[in-house]
A protein has these predicted regions:
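Conserved active-site alpha-helix within GNAT-family acetyltransferase domains
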Residues: 90-100, 203, 226-244
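Conserved hydrophobic beta-strand within the GNAT/NAT acetyltransferase core sheet
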Residues: 190, 220-224
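A conserved beta-strand-loop-helix scaffold within acyl/acetyltransferase catalytic domains
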Residues: 155-185, 189-193
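Acyl-donor-binding surface of acyltransferase catalytic domains
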Residues: 32-140
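Conserved acetyl-CoA-binding loop-helix of GNAT-fold acetyltransferases
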Residues: 65-71, 188, 198-214, 233-237
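Conserved catalytic-core motifs of GNAT/GCN5-like acyltransferases
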Residues: 100-113, 241-255
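Glycine-rich acetyl-CoA-binding "A-motif" of GNAT/NAT acetyltransferases
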Residues: 44-45, 171-174, 230
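Short amphipathic alpha-helix that is part of the acyltransferase structural core
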Residues: 1-22, 114-154
Length: 257
């Protein structure tokens, strides 16, 4: 397995679009997010793996255990790996036991338009405004470091991602983001300032973000840690269906010999 241009047109078809965190994967392949790729052949690949700048990794469809082992070892040769892997995978090949597993839930994708989202937007409290994300606003946001880390810079996020804040005058009440966009789907996330939690602002903020996504023809995907009950409740309010459990399988970098 050797490096290949992550934007190679031959790569997207190798990957299952139903993989967990697929908007991140296809965002990397489409050049919206930083990342790297390796493949068995740089000209006509049949096996490939992709890794985000923050370490989340994806392996293409495989039919044999040997192919999966080869791809995972290829990733681990150069970095610590967090492999996104569905708990309900039915393939004959399975990854080797990880050093640790982070249990996650994936929801969707679902359309970014609908009556439920319209009603949530109508619930915007009096005196609260919606402000699109810009550099000055993002500099004040709680999740600035997360989106900057995912994109490599604030400017890159503002170019390739989408965000907004719910504001009361100059106070940030909630931040909603679509940091990962790929394959026609945006993964969305939200954080409410601690003083304003429990007021339904998280789902309202995402509903307003969804209007922007719908204008761009994008669907919505949601993911969170299994034990994040508040996030699961927000997903339900937004209209996401049953969760699909998956794991981020954490592997140490292989020792150099």
């Amino acid at each position: 397995m050797d490096p290949i241009d992550v934007r190679s047109a031959s790569l997207p078809a190798l990957f299952d679009p139903a993989l967990p965190n697929a908007p991140m994967l296809f965002g990397i392949l489409e050049g919206r997010l930083p990342g790297r790729a390796i493949a068995d052949d740089s000209r006509v690949p049949t096996l490939a793996a992709v890794q985000s700048a923050e370490g989340i990794a994806f392996i293409s469809r495989t039919t044999t255990q040997a192919a999966l082992d080869t791809a995972l070892s290829g990733l681990r040769r150069d970095a610590i790996v967090g492999l996104a892997w569905p708990d309900d995978a039915t393939a004959a090949a399975i990854p080797e036991p990880p050093a640790r597993k982070q249990d996650r839930l994936g929801f969707g994708p679902i359309p970014a338009a609908g009556d439920r989202l319209d009603r949530l937007r109508d619930d915007l409290p009096t005196g609260v405004t919606v402000r699109p994300m810009d550099a000055d606003l993002l500099a004040r946001c709680e999740w600035r470091g997360l989106v900057e880390g995912a994109h490599g810079s604030i400017d890159a996020f503002l170019e390739h991602g989408i965000g907004l804040c719910l504001m009361r005058e100059d106070e940030i009440l909630a931040e909603a983001y679509a940091p990962f966009i790929g394959g026609g789907v945006a993964e969305v996330g939200v954080v409410t300032s601690e003083a304003h939690r429990g007021q339904g602002l998280a789902s309202i903020a995402i509903a307003w973000l969804a209007a922007d996504l719908a204008e761009r023809g994008l669907g919505m995907y949601w993911s969170c840690d299994t034990d994040n009950e508040a996030s699961v409740r927000v997903a339900g309010k937004l209209g996401f269906g049953p969760a699909r459990p998956f794991g981020i399988l954490l592997y140490r970098q292989l020792a150099q010999v």
